[in-house]
Amino acid sequence: MSSLRLEENRKLATAAAVCPLSNCQFSGVVISAIADEQKLEFANKYRGSCTLLCSYDSQGVVLRIVADDDRSHVLKEYMISADTDAAQMGRRSYAVSLESDNLVLRFASEQDQQLFRKVVENVKHLRPKSVFSQRTEESSASQYFQFYGYLSQQQNMMQDYVRTSTYQRAILGNSIDFQDKIVLDVGAGSGILSFFAVQAGAAKVYAIEASNMAQYAQQLVESNNVQHKISVIPGKIEEIELPEKVDVIISEPMGYMLYNERMLETYLHARKWLKPQGKMFPTHGDLHIAPFSDESLYSEQYNKANFWYQSAFHGVDLTTLHKEGMKEYFRQPIVDTFDIRICMAKSVRHVCDFLNDKEDDLHVIDIPLEFHILQTGICHGLAFWFDVEFSGTTQNVWLSTSPTAPLTHWYQVRCLLPMPIFIKQGQTLTGRVLLEANRRQSYDVTIDLHIEGTLISSSNTLDLKNPYFRYTGAPVQAPPGTSTQSPSEQYWTQVDSQGSRNSSSMLNGTISVNGMGDGSMDITHGLMHPH
């Protein structure tokens, strides 16, 4: 039942968008095959006339041939795609090359032949590539949707307590925005946000999901008995049609550094289905950027690259690759977390307005920088994190990936400079970050920094598609040099204080036992009695 319902939803949503003439049939068609190409001789391929059944498919139009007098059995099935060769022959005939068969279709009327020709032309010439296909390499899209089609990956996101709970709180805390409303869930995945919308009272939710996860979302919808509320539609929002406009759009489109994966463009594209004054959850995103100092991280990457500086590795001189190795390591953004005290200045904030910004605005993002340095030290690069706000009628809710907030599966991102720069407190660091979108669903990130009033500058270009996942789960360590008192004396003072409390308790005849509270001890018999 799940797969049948999904297929029905997919066809309804995509047929009108891609090929409005693709769901039709033609009766009384005589089908001939070319028997001799040199003599151009034809022979009837089927006994009697046939009916052609056309239906939309993601690859084009499926052409099914059945006999006029027995439509219960499909004689042959073909796919009409953009690569199909076809040509008109006279007023009622049409030649078409399908797979290994070269066929001539003689229709019952000129009108039927013209309509069938339009079906083929719609697939071959009149179907433009979707916005998504134009901006995305096929191999990248395939890997992307395969990745998000795994239950384990959905689980990883769903188990991000901060992420999932914040979304639920934002939606349920603004139930007035969802009560009896039509909702669109873009990139629905497992459908968890759609379920939250239903919990908030939504009348109808269209859950759009392009990966194979759509089938699992449909199973969850049916097993939770909300199929009358949630309609799962397999496909891309750029390639489907909805039966109506929506009041609210919900999505989780953020990637590393907010913009990675270019899902935000899809989120903005979905606004074509939003009613005037409609809501978007989230409503806007803030990308924060700050200069940082971390000698340990810089040395770690530098020493990795120095592997290629060996002149006698098993008798082989590797040094010719040292420069390229260094370039490769420093082109990788670092995904991990850190103590915010490594930041040398207040972060610069760049805002993306999901309600008003255009898709084109995200193709090239040029962010001017000006930092007033708060501490003297070596600047090793720029740190990035983001916050998003859900602006509801009842309340505003923030989801933060700041190093001061609880950790999420987005972590934070740092981009290193191959040539760090020494800067003093009170100086001004200026420059820019340039994010240029690429067809691999990511960005090339160029950093240019300059110390105002000097000739000192540094730059780097990084590949956001290829980050280094450095997070180990270990507690974040405070930056070196941040202790203002002796850590040793602080520790022993704490121990002495604890010892004094225990001694006092013993004198009073009570001690704390394994955190279970006070107990009294009979010293004579060595017995303990709980109070």
UniProtKB/Swiss-Prot annotation:
Post-translation changes: The dimethylated protein is the major form.
Cellular component per GO, a single term: histone methyltransferase complex
SUPFAM superfamilies xrefs: S-adenosyl-L-methionine-dependent methyltransferases (SSF53335)
Enzyme Commission code: 2.1.1.319
Residue stretches making up the SAM-dependent MTase PRMT-type domain: 141-450
Role this protein plays: Methylates (mono- and asymmetric dimethylation) the guanidino nitrogens of arginyl residues in proteins. May methylate histone H3 at 'Arg-17' and activate transcription via chromatin remodeling.
Subunit structure: Homodimer.
Protein name: Histone-arginine methyltransferase CARMER
Organism: Drosophila ananassae (Fruit fly)
Gene: Art4
